Amino acid sequence: MPYIATKHLNIYFEEKGDDAPVLFISGTGGDLRQRPNVLDGPLPKHHRVIAYDQRGLGRTEKPDRPYTMDEYGNDAAELLAALGIEQVDVIGVSFGGMVAQHFAIRHPSMVRKLVLCCTSPGGDMPSYPFHLIPEDLTPKERFLTLVGISDTRRDQEWQAEHPQQLRR
């Protein structure tokens, strides 16, 4: 399995394709074990796509403490440095877009282009402790857990009042 040992943790990553490098930073709950993912789409036909499990998710290390947005951004920089990539196009989706912004602010010389999808500015607060989500959840249980975390329109109160909406 492809791991990179950075200064702070072991990061699981996968890459596919050739040509100009693109760093793909996934959203809440992103895990490269989920298929299909960005590596199965058309992007690797035109780029060298690097995707990784962020700290606390998938097969990347899960330090047992809150994570800062600066750490997430630095993880991306350390991964690229370990791969010998000096400059990259970055695609950040949802929470990954927040991470991409922190990466771009902290490491501007590494970013050639920045594409932000379905995201917000985020902030400097620690992220949700994704490493505390059990790995053995059923797909439905995982969905319900992630909805409560990522969709502020559907918090626990809303879920309790609209159980029929969640059964779809």
Per-segment meaning from a language model:
Residues Q101-R106, V111-R142:
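Flexible "cap/lid" loop of the alpha/beta hydrolase fold
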Residues I50-G92:
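Active-site loop/oxyanion-hole signature of alpha/beta-hydrolase fold enzymes
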Residues T28-G29, S94, S120-P121:
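Short, flexible active-site-adjacent loop segments at beta-strand->alpha-helix junctions, enriched
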Residues T6-E61, R65:
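Conserved HGGG/HGGXW glycine-rich cap/lid loop of the alpha/beta-hydrolase fold
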